[in-house]
Amino acid sequence: MGMRARVPKVAHSTRRPPAARMWLPRFSSKTVTVLLLAQTTCLLLFIISRPGPSSPAGGEDRVHVLVLSSWRSGSSFLGQLFSQHPDVFYLMEPAWHVWTTLSQGSAATLHMAVRDLMRSIFLCDMDVFDAYMPQSRNLSAFFNWATSRALCSPPACSAFPRGTISKQDVCKTLCTRQPFSLAREACRSYSHVVLKEVRFFNLQVLYPLLSDPALNLRIVHLVRDPRAVLRSREAAGPILARDNGIVLGTNGKWVEADPHLRLIREVCRSHVRIAEAATLKPPPFLRGRYRLVRFEDLAREPLAEIRALYAFTGLTLTPQLEAWIHNITHGSGIGKPIEAFHTSSRNARNVSQAWRHALPFTKILRVQEVCAGALQLLGYRPVYSADQQRDLTLDLVLPRGPDHFSWASPD
């Protein structure tokens, strides 16, 4: 045995040092942005470095659809029109996980991370969520997971047979603890993968997906009268506070009140940017891959509009879906704030015009001012008096001409 070294004893003072003040570092907004970009880059490198998914059976024929919209524009309703189709694997706003994880970022700095998340999901690679979710997770880890009929049907769960209309409350009861790994298996068993997203603010960031030979992507761009969007946002209350902060680039500060209408201005600008990019000298790879839909047209003629959307995306309207669509668009009332992210049976036409009685005329004038370009481009008529506002015989949705959005459909 070797000799054990002796450790000299150190005399310790019995006097206690004075309590030190806690020092918290302060970072400038520029430093926060740099740190956030570094974090995002690390996440992207992690995602890219993982082995890619194996080619699914029939993957070459799979259709990928991105329902592109903004908050409170009827996108949850349109998402359900796709989700309930028996050939569709649907997820609602998967980029919620990116924005929640990187909430100090801005919409622009998070665009790339959101886009790469979309690509992985379209290819049924659910391992991409490792960067945004706990390692131990179930199907219920997805944001608003029960809105996906595919996650409530085999092979993900046996709550509802394929071809039947799912119900969220039943799905939550029976499928909450299903393994997360079943999402990939379910995704690969469908001919269509549809994602609904509200976190893209220009079309150019999606060009790599539109030109990607591994994808067969269609863009469904849903818009709504900005005056109706404002009324719906106000009714939703603080639900969107975190997202509002990211849209406005507040470095993680939540934003509830928006007296200067900065948010609705940005929403209008984003719709104009996207629509103009798709219709004014668009790149060749966009031909036949973009379709603009107004919520008001969907509310007035739901079956005609959904038939056109299904044809655009290669789906067929079944008798059961037709009956279900009629029922959910011919209910009563306009919905409650608690239904902010849910689709219930209500009168779609009344929903689309509720703002005409709910908003003060002075606020409508302000919206028309900050969203003048969007109103003109998307076909919404301004009002110039409170009487015009409340006169429901005055149609404020202009007809679409034969050349309107000529790039919406393939030649």
Swiss-Prot record:
Name of the encoding gene: CHST5
UniProt topological domain (Lumenal) ranges: 49-411
GO cellular component: Golgi apparatus; Golgi membrane; membrane; trans-Golgi network
UniProt EC number: 2.8.2.-
Cystine bridges: none
Protein name per its UniProtKB record: Carbohydrate sulfotransferase 5
Keywords carried by this UniProt record: Carbohydrate metabolism, Glycoprotein, Golgi apparatus, Membrane, Signal-anchor, Transferase, Transmembrane, Transmembrane helix
One Gene Ontology term from the biological process aspect of the record: carbohydrate metabolic process
Record topology, Cytoplasmic segments: 1-30
Tissue: Predominantly expressed in small and large intestines and colon. Weakly expressed in lymphocytes. Not expressed in other tissues. Down-regulated in colonic adenocarcinomas.
Membrane topology recorded in Swiss-Prot or TrEMBL: Single-pass type II membrane protein
